[in-house]
Amino acid sequence: MLEQMGIAAKQASYKLAQLSSREKNRVLEKIADELEAQSEIILNANAQDVADARANGLSEAMLDRLALTPARLKGIADDVRQVCNLADPVGQVIDGGVLDSGLRLERRRVPLGVIGVIYEARPNVTVDVASLCLKTGNAVILRGGKETCRTNAATVAVIQDALKSCGLPAGAVQAIDNPDRALVSEMLRMDKYIDMLIPRGGAGLHKLCREQSTIPVITGGIGVCHIYVDESAEIAEALKVIVNAKTQRPSTCNTVETLLVNKNIADSFLPALSKQMAESGVTLHADAAALTQLQAGPAKVVAVKAEEYDDEFLSLDLNVKIVSDLDDAIAHIREHGTQHSDAILTRDMRNAQRFVNEVDSSAVYVNASTRFTDGGQFGLGAEVAVSTQKLHARGPMGLEALTTYKWIGIGDYTIRA
C-alpha cells in the first residue's frame, strides 16, 4: 500500500513543480472554500474521534489538541487563505552571476519533492502541512495519530476533491489511514519516494525516526521552554508575560514549562507569582529553595521531581527553580532545554545580550512570551513544524523551509578550459 502511495506522490510532485503561483493559489482557495462547505462532515468525524479518545482516557491536554469547533475549522480555512497571500519562494533566484568563462550561473529555489509528515492528535496539522506543501509545489504523505483517523480521512477527502476539481492528481496529498504502527517503520524506509521526513510528536517518535529512517529527518516540536526572571525584572510586567506563556494555550509546544527565578528577586517575586498562578489555576512544582515561600501563598504547590525539569507538561503545571545568577540560569537551560524557545525578563540589557548570545535555542526572547514561536506570528503563515535542529531548517518552518535549490548554468555552447 505505501509503495503505491509513494509512486503516486512522486508522480504528483512532478506536476506540482510546474505550476505557477496563480495556479497553486487557485487550488488553495478551492481547498479553503471546501473546508467550510464540508465543515459538517469534518466536525462530525472529529466528534467521533474526540468521543473515542475521551473513552480511552486521553488527557485533557491531548483532547484540546484533538478537538475541532466551527470556529477552529473556520480559522484553519482562513489560514489556508493566508498562505495564498504569502510570497511564493519557488523560482526565486537566490544569487548568481557570469563566470570568467562566460557561463551565466544562478542558484534557483525549487520544491523538495515529496514530504512525509508523522504527527499526533492535531487535525489542524493536516491542513497546515498540505497547504504549505502545495504552495511550494511539493506532494505530501501524512501519517496522523490514530486518535484523529476519522478527522484526517474526512479532511484529506475534501482536499483531494478540491485537487481533482482543479485538474490535479489526488496523489498530491495522501494520508495513511491504517493505525498499524508497523507502517511508520515502513514509511521511514521510503527514501525512493520521500525526500524529507518531519516527525511531530514526542521524544519516542523522534528517537525512532533518527534510528530507523533512511530519509533526511527534521526533528522538532518538543518544547521544554524556559523563562528566566532576572533580578532587575519589573514584577508586574513579568507576571503578564508568564501568564501568557503558561496559560494562553497550555497544550502547545511553545508554552513555558520551567520558570527560573534569580535569588535576589525571589522574596518579592514569589508571593506575587503565587497569587497570579492561583488565579490562573496553575500548579507550581517548586524546588527546595522556593517551596516554603510558595506554600505560604494561595497557589497549589508540590515539590518538584528532578525528572520534571525534562518534562513537557502541556498542561497547567509550571516548574519553579531559584537560580543564583544568569550563569546558573543558562547552565540549567543548556542541561534541560530542547533548543525550542527560551526567554529572559530583565531591564539589564547586558544580561539580555548575554542570554541571547549564550542560549542556543531556535528562538530566544527578551521581555516577551515564548508563545510567539509560531509560523503565523513570525509572518511565515502556517507552519509545518518548529525545528529544534540546525540543518536544514531552524525554528518555525514556513514556505522557504520546504524548498531546496538547484544550480543552473546557461552558456553559448560554452566549454570548460
From Swiss-Prot:
Q: Which Gene3D superfamilies match?
A: Aldehyde Dehydrogenase, Chain A, domain 1, Aldehyde Dehydrogenase, Chain A, domain 2
Q: Which reaction does it catalyse?
A: L-glutamate 5-semialdehyde + phosphate + NADP(+) = L-glutamyl 5-phosphate + NADPH + H(+)
Where is it mainly found?
A: cytoplasm
Q: Which keywords fit this entry according to its UniProt record?
A: Amino-acid biosynthesis, Cytoplasm, NADP, Oxidoreductase, Proline biosynthesis
* Compartments, record wording: Cytoplasm
Q: Which InterPro entries match?
A: Ald_DH/histidinol_DH (IPR016161), Ald_DH_C (IPR016163), Ald_DH_N (IPR016162), Aldehyde_DH_dom (IPR015590), G-glutamylP_reductase_CS (IPR020593), Glu-5-SA_DH (IPR012134), GPR_dom (IPR000965)
One GO term (biological process): L-proline biosynthetic process
User: So which domain of life are we looking at?
Assistant: Bacteria
The record's GO molecular-function terms, alphabetically, read: glutamate-5-semialdehyde dehydrogenase activity; NADP binding
SUPFAM superfamilies for this protein: ALDH-like
What NCBIfam families does its record include?
PRK00197.1, proA
Summarize the protein's role. Catalyzes the NADPH-dependent reduction of L-glutamate 5-phosphate into L-glutamate 5-semialdehyde and phosphate. The product spontaneously undergoes cyclization to form 1-pyrroline-5-carboxylate.
Q: So what family is this one in? A: Belongs to the gamma-glutamyl phosphate reductase family.
What is the name of this protein? Answer: Gamma-glutamyl phosphate reductase
- Which species does the entry assign this protein to? Shigella flexneri
